[in-house]
Amino acid sequence: AVILKAIKXNPKK
């Protein structure tokens, strides 16, 4: 779930 949040928060990454 943490990874999913990071991707949503950082679409550039």
Curated annotation (Swiss-Prot):
Please provide, in alphabetical order, the Gene Ontology terms of the cellular component aspect for this entry.
Answer: ribonucleoprotein complex; ribosome
Keyword annotations for this protein, in alphabetical order, are: Ribonucleoprotein, Ribosomal protein, RNA-binding, rRNA-binding
> So which domain of life are we looking at?
Bacteria
Gene Ontology terms for molecular function: rRNA binding
Family as reported in the entry's similarity comment: Belongs to the universal ribosomal protein uS19 family.
What is the role of this chain?
A: Protein S19 forms a complex with S13 that binds strongly to the 16S ribosomal RNA.
What is the protein's given name?
Answer: Small ribosomal subunit protein uS19
Q: Which organism is it from?
A: Ash yellows phytoplasma
